[in-house]
């Protein structure tokens, strides 16, 4: 399935049905009085988090969603049927953003969470509603209220416990395939990974989700390479695993390039807990390995772990370090806010527009 993490869609809730002007007509009843029913309410547009989805690809082929309008009122005091709501299914971690691409409307963080994004219009009153002691035969009815319409952006930010970062061809996909059942594309050239990949990692009796994002290059925050758009997928992670290729020219400079891009990104990535590992140690000599390790240690100001995604050497040490940090690291403030808003949305019933009167 092709991965798509952003889509623009148009939504419109249903118009309310019109009220009806009608009078009761029966044998031997000369003045039957008004009997026009009210119009039905238009259908809502609802967004719901569905389990098992991990892409927004469905919204590439359909961008317009319109809920049906409410049925018109009829004689004999028959009210029109309400329009059926339409439900947009989205993956866990989806954000609803206004058309300006800046205003966050909602952040979905729980499976099954629902949000009424556009409420259907209220139905109009039939003439039976307007009868009174002074107006026994009203000949007026209201039209239904129009529905709401808007353009919105759907933006997916994958939810994972740990995220893999590094330069292109640092061995991130090989590491992910080694520690999980994920099967990312692996090749000996930069930018093999074009879309984020997720894998479930099991360590003894613990398991966590590991995300692999496409590699960063210098100037990514300005759009170089694949840009930094995929950094949002590790923004929710509790810990970052920074892999550096032991066979690169200078491990310290390679580390600083990625750190610079993370600091330039408009988020809290640079403040997250980071585990640094020197990868592909099987491909260099012992002398070069020591030299690269010292360079990386000076740049990162911490002792890097040594690992090989091909032979498996050092993999368990890295996984144990990740599990230890995941168990201690708190959820980021942004994720906390998202959880709080989601909890409030689930506990508080969605407010409905009050019935209008002429």
From Swiss-Prot:
It comes from Nitrobacter winogradskyi (strain ATCC 25391 / DSM 10237 / CIP 104748 / NCIMB 11846 / Nb-255). GO terms for molecular function: GTP binding; GTPase activity; magnesium ion binding. It is an enzyme of class 3 (hydrolase). This is GTPase Obg. Keywords: Cytoplasm, GTP-binding, Hydrolase, Magnesium, Metal-binding, Nucleotide-binding. Residues 1-159 form the Obg domain. Residues 335-358 are annotated as: Disordered. Residues 160-327 form the OBG-type G domain. HAMAP family: GTPase_Obg. Its cofactor is Mg(2+). It comes from the Bacteria.
């Amino acid at each position: 399935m092709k991965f798509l993490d952003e889509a623009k869609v148009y939504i419109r809730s249903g118009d309310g049905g019109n009220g009806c002007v009608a009078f009761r007509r029966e044998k031997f009843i000369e003045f039957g009085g008004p009997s026009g029913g009210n119009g039905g309410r238009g259908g809502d547009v609802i967004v719901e988090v569905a389990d098992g989805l991990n892409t927004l690809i469905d919204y590439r082929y359909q961008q317009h969603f319109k809920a049906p309008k409410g049925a018109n009122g009829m004689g004999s005091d028959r009210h029109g049927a309400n329009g059926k709501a339409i439900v947009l299914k989205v993956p866990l971690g989806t954000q609803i953003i206004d058309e300006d691409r800046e205003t966050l409307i909602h952040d979905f963080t729980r499976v099954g969470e629902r949000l009424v994004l556009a409420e259907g219009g209220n139905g109009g009153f039939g003439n039976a509603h307007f009868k009174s002691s002074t107006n026994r035969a009203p000949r007026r009815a209201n039209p239904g209220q129009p529905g709401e319409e808007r353009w919105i952006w759907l933006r997916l930010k994958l939810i994972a416990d740990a995220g893999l970062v590094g330069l292109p061809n640092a061995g991130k996909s090989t590491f992910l395939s080694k520690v999980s059942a994920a099967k990312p594309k692996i090749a000996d050239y930069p930018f093999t990974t074009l879309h984020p990949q997720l894998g479930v990692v099991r360590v003894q009796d613990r398991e966590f989700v590991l995300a692999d994002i496409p590699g960063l290059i210098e100037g990514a925050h300005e759009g170089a390479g694949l840009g930094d758009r995929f950094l949002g997928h590790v923004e929710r992670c509790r810990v970052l695993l920074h892999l550096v290729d032991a066979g690169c020219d200078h491990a310290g400079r390679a580390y600083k390039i990625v750190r610079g891009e993370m600091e330039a990104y408009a988020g809290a990535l640079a403040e997250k807990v980071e585990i640094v590992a020197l990868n592909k140690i099987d491909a260099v000599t012992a002398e070069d390995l020591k030299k690269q390790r010292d360079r990386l240690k000076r740049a990162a100001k911490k002792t890097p772990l040594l690992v090989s995604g091909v032979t498996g050497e050092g993999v368990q040490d890295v996984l144990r370090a990740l599990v230890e940090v995941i168990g201690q690291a708190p959820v980021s403030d942004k994720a906390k806010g998202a959880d709080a808003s989601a909890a409030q949305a689930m506990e508080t019933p969605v407010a409905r527009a009050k019935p209008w009167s002429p």
